[in-house]
């Protein structure tokens, strides 16, 4: 062996290296994705699902913080059958010493989604009720939305709201 490469050999090994690098990135993939926002009125896009935190309210009579969220199941969504199931399992609310999750201080309602599904291209509004949480008394409150809570729970959208942001944005409930 002379230690020299012909142009043809060089191109062949360069192509093989490129294929190997591309193949290894496909095998490892992306392990997680947590989109983060810090203000009300902002949107996150995860798995082609766009979620927007529209408003935060506080119901003092019931000691409940209410998050109004719109969810749009985007075109070409990466979800099975292109329909997105949304219920209490899709959300958590955390704060210092506080957790609301499915079956624990958390309730989700929607005036739009009668069957808890957001079909491809549709937008639905959801109200996430965190019972026992006075967000104005916490330094930081985080709302997390999981488009696929079971299979891909590492892919999520988050709104980390500080006390200062909440003081500016929080309102009293405007509906019954």
Question: Each predicted region: which residue ranges?
Answer:
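Surface-exposed edge beta-strand/loop patches
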Residues: 119-176
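The feature marks short-to-medium sequence segments in extracytoplasmic or secretory-pathway proteins
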Residues: 59, 74-124
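A generic structural signal for beta-strand entry/edge sites
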Residues: 62-66, 140
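A mature extracytoplasmic/lumenal domain signature
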Residues: 57, 71, 83-85, 130-132, ...
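Low-complexity, acidic Ser/Thr/Pro/Gly-rich terminal tails and inter-domain linkers that flank the onset
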Residues: 35-60
């Amino acid at each position: 062996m002379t230690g020299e490469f012909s142009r043809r050999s060089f191109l062949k090994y360069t192509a093989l290296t490129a294929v190997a690098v591309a193949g290894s990135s496909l095998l490892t993939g992306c392990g997680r994705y947590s989109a983060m926002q810090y203000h009300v009125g902002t949107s996150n896009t995860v798995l082609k699902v766009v979620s927007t935190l529209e408003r935060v309210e506080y119901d003092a009579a019931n000691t409940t913080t209410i998050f109004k969220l719109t969810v749009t199941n985007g075109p070409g969504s990466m979800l099975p059958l292109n329909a997105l199931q949304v219920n209490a399992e899709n959300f958590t609310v955390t704060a210092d010493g506080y957790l609301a999750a499915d079956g624990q201080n958390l309730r989700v309602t929607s005036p739009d989604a009668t069957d808890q599904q957001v079909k491809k291209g549709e937008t639905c509004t959801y109200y996430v009720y965190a019972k026992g949480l006075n967000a104005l008394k916490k330094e930081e409150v985080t709302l997390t939305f999981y488009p696929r809570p079971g299979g891909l729970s590492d892919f999520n959208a988050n709104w980390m709201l500080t006390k200062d942001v909440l003081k500016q944005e929080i309102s009293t409930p405007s509906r019954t």
